[in-house]
């Protein structure tokens, strides 16, 4: 039974899932909004909001922690210097998920995740 299980497996190994969330986070940072499947968007929301909350402190240790999670210097700098200060007065809810369509090939529910 999977009662109270804390995250979605997304039918991937743990390393693959970590790489997926990292790559989606980098894309969201660069573009501001991306289209993906609904379960991926819901899992990404949790991951990305933790990044922004951590970056809100603005100290060097937060910068290092975010770089450790993303391994992408440009995205790390963007989150710490541009995105996090914009949400300094906000307690969570940095992203929005909008359900869009059913994908033609496999009828998967698609969604747009964007920064508020």
From Swiss-Prot:
Transmembrane segments: none annotated. The keyword Kinase does not apply. GO terms for biological process: translation. Pfam families: Ribosomal_L17. Keywords: Ribonucleoprotein, Ribosomal protein. GO terms for cellular component: cytosolic large ribosomal subunit. InterPro entries: Ribosomal_bL17, Ribosomal_bL17_sf. One of its GO terms (molecular function) is structural constituent of ribosome. Belongs to the bacterial ribosomal protein bL17 family. Part of the 50S ribosomal subunit. Contacts protein L32. HAMAP family: Ribosomal_bL17. NCBIfam families: L17. This is Large ribosomal subunit protein bL17. It comes from Sulfurovum sp. (strain NBC37-1).
């Amino acid at each position: 039974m999977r009662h109270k299980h804390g995250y979605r497996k997304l039918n991937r190994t743990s390393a693959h899932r970590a790489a997926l969330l990292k790559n989606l986070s980098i894309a969201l940072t660069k573009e501001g909004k991306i289209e993906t499947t609904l379960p991926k968007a819901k899992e990404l929301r949790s991951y990305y909001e933790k990044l922004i909350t951590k970056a809100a402190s603005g100290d060097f240790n937060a910068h290092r922690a975010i770089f450790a999670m993303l391994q992408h210097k440009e995205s790390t700098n963007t989150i710490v210097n541009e995105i996090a200060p914009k949400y300094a007065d906000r307690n969570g809810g940095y992203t929005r998920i909008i359900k869009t369509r059913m994908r033609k090939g496999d009828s998967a529910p698609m969604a747009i995740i964007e920064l508020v």
